[in-house]
């Protein structure tokens, strides 16, 4: 797993709950409500779990290749 983790998905899918568990288990900091892929590309730091409602899978694939990206959805 890469040192920067991004969890994306629609509101209410459990992103923040998952991020809290991962951050605690891995001893990473949590950054909730990341505004955009461009902001994250410029400002991201290692050993952090980031959460976003607004970043799409396509944006993450293009801009955030050095992240482990987890996409969460309702079933």
Task: Identify the meaning behind each predicted range.
Residues 4:
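Walker A (P-loop) ATP-phosphate-binding motif of ABC ATPase nucleotide-binding domains
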Residues 7:
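Hydrophobic anchor at the beta1->P-loop junction of P-loop NTPases
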Residues 11:
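The conserved Walker
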Residues 14-15:
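Conserved glycine(s) of the Walker
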Residues 18:
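Hydrophobic positions on the alpha1 helix immediately C-terminal to the Walker A/P-loop
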Residues 21:
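Active-site signature of alpha/beta-hydrolase-fold catalytic machinery across serine-
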Residues 25:
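Active-site catalytic microenvironments for nucleophilic, acid-base chemistry
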Residues 29-75:
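Conserved nucleotide-sensing/catalytic segment adjacent to the nucleotide-binding pocket
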């Amino acid at each position: 797993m890469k040192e920067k983790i991004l969890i994306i998905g629609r509101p209410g899918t459990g992103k923040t709950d998952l991020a809290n568990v991962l951050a605690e288990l891995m001893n990473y900091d949590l950054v909730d409500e990341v505004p955009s892929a461009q902001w994250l590309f410029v400002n991201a730091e290692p050993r952090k779990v980031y959460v976003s409602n607004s970043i799409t899978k396509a944006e993450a694939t293009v801009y955030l290749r050095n992240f482990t990206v987890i996409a969460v959805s309702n079933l």
